[in-house]
Design a protein with these regions (language model features):
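Patatin-like phospholipase
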Residues: 1-41, 46-279
């Protein structure tokens, strides 16, 4: 019986993870009521939080595909000044808005703390971020940061530099945990999760990507991110991971990200691709 789930970071590739989870849910591979711990970085943490809500997976998939995600990003006249002064052009509001409807559907709101979220779900959610001052990985959970807001924890784990404005908490900035731990399988193993009770989704995004000379600054940041995550993934190659799905995919790029934000059909195709991969 699966009791622990590990979800890799990967920006919009998280749609593939949704597809995998939908297939496995429909085929009773896991029962969310039996899950005890979820480990996720960046988009993996976002998906993990949604799983903790225990909403019917069909409703989740419908929400992810049908929502007009392009309305979440506002390109105001101040976007350039915000980029320079606030170190990014997307702020925490995007995380609050993305989660608000899902939270309200189970009578929760965006002010819920990690402790209260655990009391609701009875699932130990672990999210990973990096404190910029000492560049150390932080494990965000109800045990380590009980009073931290759920939306803050998710945003901290997703904050890719130059794109997301890093959250400042008590004088410390936090960025995407994927630069150190994009695939937190080792933390699941360290918590003594039994081999037959853990399941993990990872990405092999070593496929085609733009040449460096053709990349803009944001794609260049994602390239660095990809290279670091591949390096950290290699460190896990000697681990004994029985129930693991590794999805082959191309490197991240802004063109695909932009198209997915605006196209419902493309989001559906990514989810279906993950679904088919799990079969």
């Amino acid at each position: 019986m699966i009791k622990n789930i590990v979800l890799s970071g990967g920006a919009y590739l998280g749609l593939l993870e949704f597809g995998v989870l939908q297939y496995l849910n429909e085929n009773l591979y896991y029962d969310i009521s039996e899950i005890e711990k979820i480990y996720g970085t960046s988009i993996g943490g976002f998906i993990g939080a949604i799983l903790c809500l225990k909403i019917d997976m069909k409703d989740v998939i419908e929400y992810i595909t049908d929502r007009p995600w392009h309305n979440l990003i506002s390109f105001s006249p101040s976007i350039l000044s915000d980029f320079y002064s606030k170190k990014g052009f997307i702020n925490k509001n995007i995380c609050e808005i993305a989660l608000s409807n899902l939270l309200r559907s189970v009578d929760l709101d965006t002010n819920i703390t990690l402790k209260n979220f655990y009391e609701y779900s009875n699932i130990e959610l672990h999210l990973y971020t990096i404190s910029l001052g000492d560049f150390e990985l932080k494990d965000l959970s109800y045990k380590t940061y009980p009073d931290l807001l759920l939306v803050d924890a998710i945003y901290m784990s997703c904050s890719v530099p130059y794109i997301f404005q890093p959250l400042n908490i008590e004088g410390e900035y936090y960025i995407d945990g994927g630069f150190i731990c994009n695939y937190p399988i080792s933390y699941c193993i360290k918590d003594n999760a039994k081999e037959d009770e853990r399941f993990a989704i990872a990405f092999n995004n070593s496929g085609k990507t733009k040449h460096i000379s053709e990349q803009n600054i944001f794609e260049f940041v994602y390239l660095i991110h990809n290279k670091l995550t591949q390096f950290t993934r290699q460190k896990n190659n000697n681990l004994n991971i029985k129930n693991e799905i590794i999805i082959d995919c191309d490197g991240l790029n802004l063109e695909d990200a932009h198209n997915l934000i605006f196209s419902k059909e493309l989001r559906q195709s990514y989810i279906k691709r993950g679904y088919d991969f799990a079969e």
